[in-house]
């Protein structure tokens, strides 16, 4: 299995999906209760697996193995389709990659102090982080696959230790708590939605698996089941250990991962747990960075190929890494602003776009070997949910829905 490309692709999908923000997810669901948190997570997982499988369906019509999503968008919606697909992808991925580079540099800069040495400057750490990890992306999907397998083992070990300390402390009464306000379930949907955003690497995975529909489909199902299981178990541990009143206290005092870790550390009595959580967060940040940059690389490669621009690895490396690196070094605030729209961009690229592509594909190619179950009714239903998810942040901003952490 370790040499299996399908398994490797599943780990890349899982690694891209499980970001450093996963551990703070219980703060988003603090007022919802465990039961409704499970329902929301499973529902959004099913929705985004469905949209991922729509990409598998559409990729059956790709003219070349290395065609990107933007090329498919142009094929079915003309130049406007390519522009929308390319802009939404690159703005989202550049914003995320700049955030990951800044976060990775921050972690690396403080690493020497653990060995009694002087801290590294943040800018130096950012450059080292980008060059070292970026080299695996430049090699291609195979390089990311190899490193992701190693890092994933580290994440599993760290996560298992945290669960080992917390699960024995779970109280059933805490898990039975009802939402403080049922509107919290609606408000949390866009944040949890982005926690299943693996679609940015669809082109890379399809190419890596040689266009095999069955392998592609299996990689999505396995690769998304892993984060779903991790999210559910982590929610079980935190909601089971912390009561609703304790969650409210955290949100009032320190609504961050540190606040959550400190609260659970008090209950478990493990002072080592905070360090393990930091290790997990670091590894999750790295695997997410690798997946996101792979998406940038493939998106730019598809764009350059379309307009007959230089498409070698050197040019792609400069175009992929230079913009987020410059912003991470000199103007991180600009990407913080862009990140505030990440949910909207993710909803468009991960749901609205594949629905539109599948709709046109079914009209023009009615006899394709593989078609996602549900017919056009499922397409319309998923589209309506996508529109609602895109509107929710505005309803929160206008005061019609309560705000949640995240």
Predicted regions, residues:
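TM-loop-TM module centered on a large, flexible mid-protein loop between adjacent transmembrane helices
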Residues: 67-79, 227-286, 306
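Loop-to-transmembrane helix boundary motifs in multi-pass membrane proteins
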Residues: 5-6, 120-130, 222, 226-229, ...
């Amino acid at each position: 299995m370790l040499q299996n490309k399908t398994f490797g692709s599943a780990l890349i999908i899982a690694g891209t999906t499980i970001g450093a923000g996963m551990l703070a997810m219980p703060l988003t669901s603090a007022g919802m209760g465990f039961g409704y948190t499970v329902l929301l997570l499973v529902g959004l997982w099913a929705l985004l697996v469905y949209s991922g499988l729509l990409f598998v369906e559409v990729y059956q019509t790709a003219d070349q193995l290395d065609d990107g999503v933007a090329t498919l968008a142009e094929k079915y919606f003309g130049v406007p389709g390519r522009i929308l697909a390319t802009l939404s992808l690159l703005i989202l991925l550049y914003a995320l990659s700049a955030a990951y580079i800044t976060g990775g540099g921050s972690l690396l800069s403080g690493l020497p102090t653990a060995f009694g040495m002087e801290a590294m400057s943040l800018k130096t750490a950012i450059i080292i982080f980008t060059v070292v990890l970026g080299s695996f992306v430049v090699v291609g999907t195979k390089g990311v696959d190899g490193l992701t397998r190693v890092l994933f083992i580290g994440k599993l070990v760290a996560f298992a230790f945290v669960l080992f300390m917390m699960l024995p402390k779970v109280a059933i009464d805490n898990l039975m708590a009802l939402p403080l306000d049922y509107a919290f379930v609606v408000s949390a949907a866009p944040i949890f939605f982005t926690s299943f955003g693996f679609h940015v690497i669809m082109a890379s995975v399809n190419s890596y698996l040689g266009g095999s529909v069955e392998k592609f489909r299996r990689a999505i199902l396995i690769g998304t089941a892993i984060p779903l299981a991790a999210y559910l178990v982590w929610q079980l541990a935190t909601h089971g250990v912390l009561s609703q009143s304790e969650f409210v206290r955290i949100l009032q005092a320190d609504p961050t991962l540190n606040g959550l870790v400190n609260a659970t550390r008090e209950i478990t009595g493990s002072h080592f747990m905070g360090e393990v959580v930091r290790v997990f967060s670091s590894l999750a940040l790295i695997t997410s960075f690798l997946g996101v940059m792979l998406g940038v690389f493939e998106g730019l490669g598809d764009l350059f190929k379309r307009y007959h621009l230089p498409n070698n690895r050197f040019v792609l490396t400069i175009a992929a890494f230079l913009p987020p690196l410059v912003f991470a070094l000199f103007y991180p605030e600009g990407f913080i602003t862009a990140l505030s729209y990440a949910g909207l961009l993710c909803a468009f690229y991960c749901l609205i776009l594949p629905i539109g592509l599948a709709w046109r594909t079914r009209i023009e190619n009615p006899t394709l070997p593989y078609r996602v179950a549900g017919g056009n009714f499922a397409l319309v239903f998923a589209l309506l949910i996508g529109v609602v998810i895109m509107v929710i942040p505005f309803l929160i901003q206008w005061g019609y829905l309560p705000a949640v952490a995240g």
